[in-house]
């Protein structure tokens, strides 16, 4: 599906969203999660379908999971605006895999990066809870990426507030995702990723009460010559560095852009 940008229409965006829903239903049989560092870059007319998965080993005191899965669809509706639809599934220990959230929102590119330098964006997402007696949530925060030659540093800082009658906290949750990456060539790269989560900023507690993990990740990028079709893959091992976190998390990402 590699149409010239000038021929892409809102109808095609709707078709892609429908495709994402179909994939989300099928994904109920796989093992996936959302440990992924997002880029601030926005490209008008580009459609991206992403799958972010994880499998957990050695349950933590506050995290007792088997697997989780996130499917994300993005569409560049303007030079700096991006429309986002997401779905999230999770399987806890002793439970079955369940659809947990449906999410919709957007991203605005504040500072556009050209080659080396800084890129900056802001993302906002409304997360609809799909399970009874769980609160809806609003996620918002900045994304930044700095590039110098083959090296780059990316950080996402997201705040999450609960809304609705089933709120469990009145404060905000904080999630910080970061990545240091070195590209060896146009296809291969290695990096280190880290993920931190404080579930209630008004009662942050000790380090071991929070969820923190980091580890090495390998990246592969493929581009179809003569077309706009791009594939990106990543696989890594994240080690829990707090008592609340699972000992080991195997993460994998797959993304197609056109």
Question: What are these model-derived regions, one by one?
Answer:
Residues 15-27:
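Bacterial N-terminal signal peptides
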Residues 31-258:
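Transmembrane beta-barrel domains of Gram-negative outer membranes and organellar outer membranes
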Residues 9-10:
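Short, low-complexity intrinsically disordered segments enriched in A/P/G/S/L with frequent Arg
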